[in-house]
Amino acid sequence: MFDSLKNFLKKSIEDLDGKELEISKEFQEYHNKDSKYIIKNWLFESPQYRKWRVTKLDGGDKLQVFNTVAYPNFKSESPILGADILWFGTSQKLLAIFDYQPLIQEKKYLYQYCSSLDFIKKKYSVFDNNKMKNIYDSKKYFSPWVMICRGNKLNLDRDLNSIFYLFVSDYLRINKLNQNNQFLNYEQIKNKQIDYDKYSAEKDPADKLFKSFFGENWTCNFINNFLFTLNNYSKD
């Protein structure tokens, strides 16, 4: 499941003169003890994005997960793209969260880089679930227009791909339009991305899920050496 999303990202990154990077075998593909859960990861970079990672978790009919995070290079104050998609096969429920995760909460910055999400939410009302906004910290790395969907099989089959393609394409378009920083300099951007990784490594809700499937040692290594690699960096 979700191969079309991964392939779309790969093509989009290649169009930016990007490339796939080699990662360690234990992160490329890892199985839990009875192989009921399999995790696969990919890592890309381009001149515009220092790190663009993709994760797929295959739990068969019970659970399917897709996650991607894009980090612009330190010369760009653009937000970090984040997407989490979970399909619970037993209950036939879809949970998805898409956001352009801002480096700062300044009003002008948010409007310039994140407000186009509002257009997507209005076009696809299923991704405008205000009742679930308590699941994130709005004062940290989330925009006021974070897109949240709690849907069903119809939303999975009919809506998800179209929304995801628009979400990614619009992110790339906005970042291409904003070549000159107005709010942050290089060192500030780097420090904000370090803060983001430290915050995410501590707060990531997938931590418990991964530990239950793959054990604590592998999960800690995965979080620090693949997901949030700036977690152990010191700020300048």
UniProtKB/Swiss-Prot annotation:
Gene Ontology biological process terms in this record: phytochromobilin biosynthetic process
Catalytic activity: 15,16-dihydrobiliverdin + oxidized 2[4Fe-4S]-[ferredoxin] = biliverdin IXalpha + reduced 2[4Fe-4S]-[ferredoxin] + 2 H(+)
UniProt keyword annotation of Signal present: no
Pfam families noted in UniProt: Fe_bilin_red
Keyword Lyase: no
UniProt KW keywords: Oxidoreductase
E.C. numbers: 1.3.7.2
Gene Ontology molecular functions: 15,16-dihydrobiliverdin:ferredoxin oxidoreductase activity; cobalt ion binding
Catalytic EC class: oxidoreductase
Family: Belongs to the HY2 family.
Task performed by this protein: Catalyzes the two-electron reduction of biliverdin IX-alpha at the C15 methine bridge.
Protein name: 15,16-dihydrobiliverdin:ferredoxin oxidoreductase
The organism of origin for this protein: Prochlorococcus marinus (strain MIT 9515)
Name of the encoding gene: pebA
